[in-house]
Amino acid sequence: MATSDSIVDDRKQLHVATFPWLAFGHILPYLQLSKLIAEKGHKVSFLSTTRNIQRLSSHISPLINVVQLTLPRVQELPEDAEATTDVHPEDIPYLKKASDGLQPEVTRFLEQHSPDWIIYDYTHYWLPSIAASLGISRAHFSVTTPWAIAYMGPSADAMINGSDGRTTVEDLTTPPKWFPFPTKVCWRKHDLARLVPYKAPGISDGYRMGLVLKGSDCLLSKCYHEFGTQWLPLLETLHQVPVVPVGLLPPEVPGDEKDETWVSIKKWLDGKQKGSVVYVALGSEVLVSQTEVVELALGLELSGLPFVWAYRKPKGPAKSDSVELPDGFVERTRDRGLVWTSWAPQLRILSHESVCGFLTHCGSGSIVEGLMFGHPLIMLPIFGDQPLNARLLEDKQVGIEIPRNEEDGCLTKESVARSLRSVVVEKEGEIYKANARELSKIYNDTKVEKEYVSQFVDYLEKNTRAVAIDHES
């Protein structure tokens, strides 16, 4: 295996195994982290299922050893479903059930190869105890923001038992008592209603996360100290485990300018004035209603702003739901709007000089990508940690959340249009633009990013179980 000059000769080469959850929003950061560890001269084994590995072929570094796993069949899933993109959100619990069925194969790998470290995702609640019994050091790498993890519960035991003391709507819509500082990070009433479609029989995410946190030697956070000043120490206090920031792992803009999809979109963007276009993308796995899509579309129309909408037909709250754009919308906005209905090269679009703002669902990956390019955010969070992310970002004044009806979450075209214009046109938006530009300097500081990676790998080198045993003997 190729090695990097950055590892000192007298240090042992580690074998690190990484095992993400079956969602590309998790798989890609895990793959990126694996590559960075390998570039420091360590052996890395990346574990995922066969079909996902095939779909990753263009992303996999030759430095990484790929371990293909066979996902067990689960009756409720389509035959080739191996990632969250392959299923409706209400079927994700069955994908987790299938993922749990990987336990025997992963255990055999650990027994046969004895890695020094195993880095795993929140879903793999069964893994820490197995790794511990084999003398393997254990780390949970969270792609979820640290404030969202802290919001889940005051301790791993509380998460496991489902007993964090929050029993009323008021409890859930105010910052929890274990937050020792003022913050706006909390759900609102309409956010709670959105959690219901995602609940299903089986093992809860809180139980999974609690066992993962309780069984880990450390927690790896996709964050900077500068952005998680209060939150990283809070996580250490709540869970009594070292929290190691690994940096933001910002993705690289692809270099192939001849990609047919990008050529078409770029031609359209090139025809627009610099700093005039809003990019709209709500992710490919969120549940949105027909009413929300209509109000969002009509709000874009009402705003009068040029836009590119990455509109991969959204999934409705039920599998039978059909979600459509309003009649005549595409034709009426054809001169200033581009509705792109297949996969869109998000990084390239955000990097184009005509783009001036990003209407986003506030997934953690999209936040990084938007702020990398200094774009203020117009935030439309849908579920889970997305509302928590939006509240924190609004508090940091890098954008605003589109107002909804507090009780039922209803969206209006007027609130969409007003929010868009407030951020990218009106004078009040200057503060959001300035703060987003300042954050982009941090997000694009390659020296700082490399320092985080070096410190993280140094932590792995100094804190393996083998090192601890050597020190004791």
UniProtKB/Swiss-Prot annotation:
UDP-alpha-D-glucose binds at A344, Q346, H361, S366, E369, D385, Q386. SUPFAM superfamilies: UDP-Glycosyltransferase/glycogen phosphorylase. Its EC number is 2.4.1.-. It comes from the Eukaryota. The active site is at H26, D121. An anthocyanidin binds at H26, G384. It is an enzyme of class 2 (transferase). It catalyses: steviolmonoside + UDP-alpha-D-glucose = steviolbioside + UDP + H(+); rubusoside + UDP-alpha-D-glucose = stevioside + UDP + H(+); stevioside + UDP-alpha-D-glucose = rebaudioside E + UDP + H(+); rebaudioside A + UDP-alpha-D-glucose = rebaudioside D + UDP + H(+). It holds the Pfam family UDPGT. Keywords: Glycosyltransferase, Transferase. GO terms for molecular function: UDP-glucosyltransferase activity. Leaves of the 'sweet herb' Stevia rebaudiana contain a mix of steviol glycosides, compounds that are unique in the plant world because of their intense sweetness and high concentration in leaf tissue. Stevia leaves have been used as natural sweeteners in South America for centuries. Belongs to the UDP-glycosyltransferase family. Involved in the biosynthesis of steviol glycosides in leaves. Converts the mono-glycoside steviolmonoside to the bi-glycoside steviolbioside. Converts the bi-glycoside rubusoside to the tri-glycoside stevioside. Converts the tri-glycoside stevioside to the tetra-glycoside rebaudioside E. Converts the tetra-glycoside rebaudioside A to the penta-glycoside rebaudioside E. This is UDP-glycosyltransferase 91D2.
